[in-house]
Amino acid sequence: MKAVLFDLDGTLLDTLQDLTDATNHTLRHFGSPEKTAAQMRYIIGSGAYFQLQEALGENLAKVDIQQVYAFYRAYYDVHSTDKTAPYPGVVEAVNALAKKYPVGIVSNKPHAVVAELCARFFPGVYALGEQAQLRPRKPEPDMIRKALEDLGADSCVYVGDTQIDVQTARNVNAPCLCVLWGFRDRDQLEAVGAEHFCETAADLAAAVEKLMKG
């Protein structure tokens, strides 16, 4: 059986402003320059550790990244839905696909945050985030394999918006549908071998269906 697996940030949910706010709250506390949302757009994708390391830049050597991460998590876990919302049309697309196929959401965010966001915006849809007992995270195949096992599927179409997603799909021999409303531009995705694209959420279900039948 084939499933449909989605990335979360930049694919289903517009989390950019909440991630930017949490990062800047953290940067201010540790004496580092803030980032604009435009800058953050190209940092997001590999999880909060990488995000914070990139945002700190040359100041990374001056701080304890574990303390930085703990401070960030304490803020973001409380404010993760302040400005976050689904991209227009994606809820309808996910619900339509869920009537035909096993559907899941797999994110590098901590599992507790993923579960809360998905319960709020995609109730009833399988959700999996990073857990201590389930590493390494994407783009390694472990989380995808776990999701497929839980869904009773043996393969998938994977939907995402970053280079990490393209590599994730490649690592499980799955076709990757790249959405173009997320955190990366088409040329960045093509540079890592992306072949399938979706420009609007109105076309999302049909684009997935095409790959499911391919």
Predicted feature locations:
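Glycine-centered short loops/turns at secondary-structure junctions
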Residues: 100-101, 173, 193
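Substrate-recognition "cap/lid" segment bordering the active-site pocket of phosphatases
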Residues: 82-83, 110-159, 163-172, 186-188
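Substrate-recognition element of Asp-dependent hydrolases with the DxDx(T/V) motif
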Residues: 23, 90-118
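N-terminal helical cap/lid subdomain that shapes the substrate entry/recognition surface
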Residues: 2-91, 99
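Short acidic-hydrophobic, aromatic-tinged amphipathic segments that line or gate anion-handling sites
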Residues: 196-200
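Short, glycine/polar-rich helix-capping loops at beta-to-alpha or helix-loop-helix junctions
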Residues: 181-191
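Glycine-rich phosphate-binding loop signature in dinucleotide/nucleotide-binding domains
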Residues: 98-101, 150-154, 211-212
